[in-house]
């Protein structure tokens, strides 16, 4: 009798411990990204213990415990809910889903090679993960739960929990609001826009005595968080030492003591195209550029440079939204535009190698800098050259073993670390090479992180995330450089000012020249208040487009 009691107590204790370990695994899987084949041996042992106990106690003999006809239903539903959650985790680590307007605007664009790569990465990440977790949870529900009803109830609870966390992690109501209101059909007047937008044609813009050239470099996802803690970042070891030194030795707005400077992401400026649009026009990208006629009449710094005789070239080495970029810069009077196909041909790159290394035809940063050098060797002055890097793109960068080799090439965090390290190194090499060029002394170089990193690796929960800004070889000394708070809209007048242009009133678009003492809208209003006003601008731009169409018809 006592032996039976002791046996039951031992079985109960083992069962409780095993169930606790299994439930811990379920929770960890649910809230964190579980990588295939890296599951704790303790979890596997716990499942085996439950399986053995289930057999010894003959639970499997109970009525309705095991029906073969129910297995496909349980397997399919379980795989579906686990894949749904895995997909959400992947998307949150890859895209800025908190910016509903940007996501919906991006989805309006044609499906390109970069989008295919994202789909490929999504499937390669989520399918193996889902398969492994599904097998383990399938064993869990069959060992621990003794009927199909209970198993389906578990799956239902899993699904409901996922939907609840979708509403917590993603601003679903913002998506619903935007889709139901359709900005393209909603016309409204914005007092904020009218009072704060400065039309470049309405103010005096004076050229310097000698026109200065411009090299504008957008570094993919490069934020100050990649620096070490001493310099305002979040890393134990500095991933961008060369960029950090450049920021310290040159002008970097927002710097403070040993911390390098950075800009804030405001509404309508959280992806590569939206930031270029915003920094060029001083107007946030909150409505579709192609479908909003009035935006084509607003003047960017590219149009201003065009009016003053500048030769202007733009290129990007990756196909992501290339046609969108191309149409925008041509509309803004850029003379020559080159895409990945052009770079591949001119640099004589092997397409098969590119696809093998990165999954699609994209030109890595080291080759993009080479292409920039070839252009600068032949371009006539005065000129502006704008180009983008790509290697540090979310979710884990584009690892190049020829730059820095890591032991575990499947470690996503290490991939991103060495990728950031390589971009910093390649940028520095490029800038050093420019110093020997005849045009260098008369050329302002502006370096931006195009936006904050869209994933969570290395940056999660860091409160002070900002995109990098560096102004090199400029003709002015800023009145105030430290502790400045600014966003993308302020880059429109600041870029021109860095080239020696004088702007009466120190404002263009919605932006403020950071070389002046004037306060930016972020400094005046705060970022949250500014974002609320920016979100209302879409209706005003539709309103102005309506008036434009009406005036054109009357003419």
Where are these regions (language model features)?
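Generic detector of well-ordered alpha-helical segments enriched in charged/polar residues
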Residues: 89, 108, 120, 132-133, ...
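Short extracytoplasmic/periplasmic juxtamembrane "stem" segments immediately C-terminal to an N-terminal membrane anchor
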Residues: 106, 184-199
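Solvent-exposed soluble domains appended to multi-pass membrane proteins
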Residues: 200-555
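Basic, amphipathic N-terminal segments that precede the first structured/catalytic domain
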Residues: 162-191, 355-364, 368-371
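Transmembrane and membrane-interface helices of multi-pass
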Residues: 2-183
